[in-house]
Amino acid sequence: MVRIDFEEGKILWSYKLDDICKDRKPLAGEGSCTVGFSAPISVARDVLYAGTLDGRFSAHSTVNGNKLWEFDTLRGYQTVNGNPAAGGSIDAAGPVIVDDWVFINSGYSQHGQMGGNVVLAFSIK
């Protein structure tokens, strides 16, 4: 992930993901584990929210790119209606920000990625 000053043509900061797929393969099931940002990012209050193909969801400072926090979505969940569900790859749709909440879809299984299908909500207060 890179922040660029388009007027000056300079890279202001960059953030590189660690490759953790070797350790995640047992969790990936039949899906493939790929490292990378693929879904669009979202920004609110100088914080950038981004999901990865290997199931990580993180918040970063827009000033310097430093990671503020990270949540691993590749796991099982008990949903609000009592059904079990699983998270996985974050791809296609980016985080949606409404008021003091960020919503993310985890478990996008297209193109052989790690399936599941949950919507997760994070408070940004």
Model-derived features: positions:
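Extracytoplasmic/lumenal domain signature
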Residues: 1-37, 42-92, 96-125
